[in-house]
Regions:
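One-carbon transfer enzymes
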Residues: 1-204
Length: 204
């Protein structure tokens, strides 16, 4: 039986512990799955955009700081923010870059060709980027993505925050296959779990 070739899309070398666990799981199932490369989306920072958002970023960093202190009392979740070098599991990195045309971000043709040469069966999105159609077309079966939140109510980041803010009883999640509408796709699985008092606990 032919092995499924899987790639993970990230932002840089260091990833959260959940992406690292996923990479290790793929490696451990080497009779059915194979992952020889990961894709890192990297782009130049827009300084004007950063300056416009600086107050929001400072405020959110404070929330993260205090919630992270609270997480240290939860043995299971205390490493929620820990970053791990993905290259320890998957050695080869493919760097691709985005460029902007109007309100759209696309990838350079040479980068798309690099991804095509890998002949991935499936890509898994584990980054903060909206995936454009040119990257979707590089795989045999498409790109899978996990989302926190009930998509009928909340579509924006940060994950797990808005349900706490609006005091929702439950928090949704879904796994979807991304399509050309970019921010939506075909839902493969979805469900709900109880909303916790702090969004870091809920997103961990």
């Amino acid at each position: 039986m032919k092995k499924l070739k899987i790639g993970i899309i990230v932002n840089g070398n260091f990833v959260d512990k959940y992406t690292h666990q996923l990479a290790r799981w793929i490696k451990s199932n080497n009779k059915k799955l194979v992952s020889t490369s990961f894709i890192s989306i990297e782009k130049k920072k827009d300084l004007n955009f950063i300056n416009k958002k600086i107050l929001k970023k400072i405020f959110f960093k404070l929330i993260i700081f205090f919630e992270n202190l609270l997480l240290q009392f939860h043995q299971i979740h205390k490493s929620h923010l820990k970053k791990i070098d993905l290259r320890k599991v998957i050695k080869n990195k493919i760097i691709i870059q985005k460029y902007k045309i109007g309100n759209k971000y696309l990838f350079k043709n040479k980068d798309i060709e690099k991804v095509k040469k890998e002949k991935f069966d499936i890509l898994i999105r584990s980054c903060g980027e909206i995936i454009s159609e040119d990257l979707i077309k590089t795989t045999k079966y498409g790109i899978l993505s996990f989302h926190h939140g009930d998509y009928r109510k909340f579509r924006g980041s940060p994950a797990g925050f808005w349900e706490v803010f609006y005091r929702e009883i439950k928090t949704g999640f879904m796994i979807q296959k991304i399509d050309k509408t970019l921010d939506f796709g075909n839902i493969i699985s979805n469900g709900f779990f109880q909303t916790k008092s702090f969004f870091f606990i809920k997103s961990s």
